[in-house]
Amino acid sequence: MTCDCCGGKKKLFEIFYSEGEGGQKIRFCPDCWDVVERLKSDQASGERELYGIHQLQLRKRAKNPSPAFLAWKNAHYPD
């Protein structure tokens, strides 16, 4: 299993997280999931400055993103 954001492979006993339903599931490693959770929190609370910082962090982590991840990110967390 690989992370759809950074392309990292699952290690032994490592938990991967998923977002979405059905065929649109996006898988995240724990590090990428942490940034996504922060983006959700920033968006819900209206923190534009933190939202921008976490957007930058997610872009830096996305070294080898899947096309499904890019579509999901643009739909849910546009720049």
Where are these regions (language model features)?
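Short Cys/His-rich "knuckle" micro-motifs
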Residues: F13-F16, L39-S41
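Glycine-centered signal
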Residues: C6-G7, E21
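Short linker/helix segments within small regulatory modules
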Residues: E14-I26
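Intrinsically disordered, low-complexity boundary segments flanking structured domains
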Residues: M1-D4, I15
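Short cysteine-rich clusters marking metal-coordination/redox-active sites
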Residues: C3-C6, C29-C32
